[in-house]
């Protein structure tokens, strides 16, 4: 085979450009929340798995937390069941919880593990129930009624994170595994809860004191007052954009997870456009990234 010198030079240039970033993040924990289009497009699924394997290969410690709402919706539809949502949260009765656990802890989790392993990784799948990984409690929610008075809303088996058993994850990391975590938790009575994957990822990053939290989404990032993507934000700036309504709707809980993680010691959090092939690598190995970075060190 004849060496194409021009192509070889380009490859060498790419590798040397990545070197400072590899050195910066070597032996650091990177928590990645995997969801959205990146989980439903085969090409994006493959690029994500290869990205995770590459991070591990060059000495970083990726930890994957995944969603799977569309997959749950599909099975509920096939079974002729309906699931209401309140402010984006799925109302989860006992039967629905069984289906959620089957989809997230079974099919979705094992598919991700299999794909990472196919590309040379050594992934291991977990739910929050394994080794009491995620201690949960029932999520208490209120809505403002027509009379302006807050009324409680019962979402069923929808949970909030109390704590994360970081020792289990650190043990897997030390043994060179890539943990892949389904967003299910268990309370002290043994009840299983469905938990928002962004929330789980943020709490996992917090308890591990990760170097970076990455939330893969179906949008380019946080949009500023001019409608353009804001590439960098401090916690103070985020608070201001929420107060004036620039950040609103479904972006608020997502960015709140990132904000809470940063305020709890995670070095930085980034909302990444998961529709971009190899978004994870582009975020780690380039200055520009592919989303909105939130860090106390900006400015």
Swiss-Prot record:
It is found in: Cytoplasm. Its EC number is 2.7.2.8. PANTHER family: N-ACETYLGLUTAMATE SYNTHASE, N-ACETYLGLUTAMATE SYNTHASE, MITOCHONDRIAL. One of its GO terms (molecular function) is ATP binding. Belongs to the acetylglutamate kinase family. ArgB subfamily. Keywords: Amino-acid biosynthesis, Arginine biosynthesis, ATP-binding, Cytoplasm, Kinase, Nucleotide-binding, Transferase. GO terms for biological process: arginine biosynthetic process via ornithine; L-arginine biosynthetic process. One of its GO terms (cellular component) is cytoplasm. NCBIfam families: argB. Pathway: Amino-acid biosynthesis; L-arginine biosynthesis; N(2)-acetyl-L-ornithine from L-glutamate: step 2/4. CDD domains: AAK_NAGK-C. This is Acetylglutamate kinase. It catalyses: N-acetyl-L-glutamate + ATP = N-acetyl-L-glutamyl 5-phosphate + ADP. The gene is argB. The lineage of its organism: Bacteria, Pseudomonadati, Pseudomonadota, Gammaproteobacteria, Moraxellales. Substrate binds at residues 68-69, 90, 194. It is an enzyme of class 2 (transferase). The record marks 33, 254 as: Transition state stabilizer. Catalyzes the ATP-dependent phosphorylation of N-acetyl-L-glutamate. Disulfide bonds: none annotated. Its main location: cytoplasm.
């Amino acid at each position: 085979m004849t060496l194409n010198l021009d192509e070889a030079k380009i490859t060498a240039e790419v590798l040397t450009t990545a070197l400072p970033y590899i050195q910066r993040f070597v032996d650091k924990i990177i928590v990645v929340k995997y969801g959205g289009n990146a989980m439903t497009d085969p090409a994006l699924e493959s690029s994500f798995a290869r990205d995770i394997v590459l991070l591990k290969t060059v000495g970083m410690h990726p930890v994957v937390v995944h969603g799977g709402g569309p997959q749950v919706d599909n099975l509920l539809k096939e079974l002729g069941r309906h699931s209401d949502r309140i402010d984006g949260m799925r109302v989860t009765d006992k039967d629905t919880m069984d289906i959620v656990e089957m989809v997230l802890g079974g099919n979705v989790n094992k598919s991700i593990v299999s794909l990472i392993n196919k590309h040379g990784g050594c992934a291991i799948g977990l739910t929050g129930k394994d080794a009491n990984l995620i201690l949960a409690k029932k999520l208490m929610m209120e809505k403002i009624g027509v009379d302006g008075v807050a009324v409680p809303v019962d979402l069923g088996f929808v949970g909030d994170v109390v704590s994360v058993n970081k020792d289990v994850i650190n043990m897997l990391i030390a043994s060179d595994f890539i943990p892949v975590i389904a967003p299910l938790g268990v309370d002290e009575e043994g009840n299983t809860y469905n938990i928002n994957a962004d929330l789980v990822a943020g709490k996992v990053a917090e308890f591990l004191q990760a170097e970076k939290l990455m939330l893969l989404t179906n949008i380019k990032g946080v949009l500023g007052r001019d409608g353009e993507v804001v590439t960098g934000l401090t916690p103070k700036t985020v608070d201001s954009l929420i107060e004036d309504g620039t950040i609103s709707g479904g972006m608020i809980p997502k960015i709140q997870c990132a904000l809470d993680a940063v305020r709890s010691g995670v070095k930085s959090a980034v909302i990444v456009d998961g529709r971009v092939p190899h978004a994870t690598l582009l975020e780690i190995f380039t200055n520009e990234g592919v989303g909105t970075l939130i860090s106390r060190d900006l400015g």
